[in-house]
């Protein structure tokens, strides 16, 4: 869809497309991880912080992906601030999930968060 968009943009579309994809993938993975944490019967109380961060990260990633898709007359400072918030949410969520890496869903989620964080960093660098 980015290639079909008539707005020329001023950022590498491959870097942009990767970031959009990673944001939506991370949002889905974090939502699924939160749900999986809720199924850990004897550990739900201990996983409250992880669940909360998963859901916060999912919402922020979803919003970031939607902001990035809109190309026409984008506001660079707003977009950069959103990317910064997303990379921070991903870093925080990954750190928490890594504490529970013995649970496969948390390990997978941490990896998705790190990929999204890296994609946000790459796009921020391309926007400078």
Q: What are these regions, as identified by a protein language model?
A:
Residues 1-128:
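Amphipathic alpha-helical hairpins
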């Amino acid at each position: 869809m980015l290639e079909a968009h008539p707005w020329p943009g001023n950022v590498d579309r491959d870097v942009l497309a990767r970031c959009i994809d990673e944001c939506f993938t991370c949002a889905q993975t974090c939502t699924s991880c939160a749900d999986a944490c809720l199924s850990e019967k004897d550990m739900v109380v201990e996983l409250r912080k992880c669940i909360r961060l998963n859901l916060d990260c999912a919402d922020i990633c979803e919003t970031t992906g939607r902001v990035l898709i809109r190309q026409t007359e984008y506001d660079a400072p707003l977009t950069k601030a959103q990317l910064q918030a997303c990379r921070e949410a991903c870093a925080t969520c990954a750190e928490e999930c890594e504490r529970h890496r013995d649970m496969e869903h948390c390990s997978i989620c941490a990896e998705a968060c790190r990929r999204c964080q890296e994609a946000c960093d790459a796009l921020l660098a391309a926007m400078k």
